[in-house]
Regions:
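Extracellular receptor-binding modules and their adjoining Ser/Thr/Gly/Asp/Asn-rich linkers
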Residues: 2-58, 114-128
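Surface-exposed interaction regions enriched in Ser/Thr/Asp/Glu
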Residues: 81-128
């Protein structure tokens, strides 16, 4: 079993909902799920309802930025960026999530690019 420097077991990233074994400040269990979105273009404003992501009864939700990234591929570059990267006002990648609005993937780039968004979300449920 692999553990981090604090003795916590590593969570594998999967698109199947898993209970992390952690609890939120209100004592509710925290769940985790990793999603992938393949997008192409020089700008993006993509909205995804929580129900479309297979989520229901969500109470609190946030993006686990330590396990989320965007893989960028252009004709001259291939690499990874944080999901919230601001290089300039016309070059950024941003992911936000809320119970009311769902997941928003938003980007602007001067190039026509392929983007693979890997977004790991953590959340609690109203039913717990």
């Amino acid at each position: 079993m692999l553990v981090d420097r604090y003795g916590n077991t590593f969570q594998s990233l999967t698109n199947v909902e898993k209970n992390t074994g952690e609890t939120f400040i209100d004592g509710k269990p925290i769940y985790i799920k990793t999603l992938r979105f393949d997008e192409r273009g020089s700008s993006l404003n993509s909205w995804h309802k929580l129900s479309d992501l297979g989520l229901s009864n969500v109470n609190d939700i946030w993006i686990d930025e330590s396990n989320s990234f965007v893989h960028i591929e252009t004709s001259s570059y291939s690499g990874f960026q944080s999901v919230n990267t601001y290089t300039a006002s016309n070059n950024y990648k941003r992911a936000t999530i809320s119970v009311a609005d769902g997941l928003n993937l938003n980007s602007q780039d001067g190039n026509d690019i392929n983007m693979a968004w890997i977004i790991t979300i953590k959340y609690t449920k109203t039913t717990d």
